[in-house]
Amino acid sequence: MHTRKAITEAIRKLGVQTGDLLMVHASLKAIGPVEGGAETVVAALRSAVGPTGTVMGYASWDRSPYEETLNGARLDDKARRTWPPFDPATAGTYRGFGLLNQFLVQAPGARRSAHPDASMVAVGPLAETLTEPHELGHALGKGSPVERFVRLGGKALLLGAPLNSVTALHYAEAVADIPNKRWVTYEMPMLGRNGEVAWKTASEYDSNGILDCFAIEGKPDAVETIANAYVKLGRHREGVVGFAQCYLFDAQDIVTFGVTYLEKHFGATPIVPAHEAAQRSCEPSG
């Protein structure tokens, strides 16, 4: 049974320091049994960064109608009337991004951003700076909490989470100068100041596959591809927390690498042999 002290020490051994801005992607199952459960893991993370540090997570929303309204799909009138609007103060988190985020949302002093599908949660001195503003159309790219996280010198921590979990690399996808990016549209029920509900349409880069070749089911997406290439450079930290294999990345460094990677291989004039650039595969070309 893992204790708060042991988890805190393991996180610090990875390279987390007092005052850090830390975006966490966690698998509680991978960490293993913990005294006090997920609340203890949150407490350990906050202990690792100290009172001057901030912990951030990707909360999203467990009732997001993203799939139901994707690219012109439409809910029937009854569903639209009864679908709850997004309220950052009460909305549940999307469990596909890890149960830990729900406990971050419930932590004292937590702030949550207003974009329903890409909602971020943060706890610590930078929480308000990170989470506000967050408007539709700015999910993970420019003007988003992820951009502010990167610019403020954040670190991305994978606690047993796979390499396709590095949310900061979606920012790299958004800002990289490459042609043929995929776009999506979807609708979200927004809560007005007077309690009224308004369905609003968002247009965003497709974070599930920024290019066609990264949107093939069963194949690595851009985030996983870039993260694997970055790990080979050895500029990150690795270790074990509980039973979980963990990675710690400097967000600015991995994002800069990701932008360069995408522009090199998929830019208007990619720096790869023409026959390789023309292939549908998104496998690294050297």
Curated annotation (Swiss-Prot):
It holds the Pfam family Antibiotic_NAT. Its EC number is 2.3.1.81. GO terms for molecular function: aminoglycoside 3-N-acetyltransferase activity. Coiled coil: none annotated. It catalyses: a 2-deoxystreptamine antibiotic + acetyl-CoA = an N(3)-acetyl-2-deoxystreptamine antibiotic + CoA + H(+). GO terms for biological process: response to antibiotic. It comes from the Bacteria. InterPro entries: Amioglycoside_AcTrfase, Antibiotic_NAT-like. Belongs to the antibiotic N-acetyltransferase family. This is Aminoglycoside N(3)-acetyltransferase III.
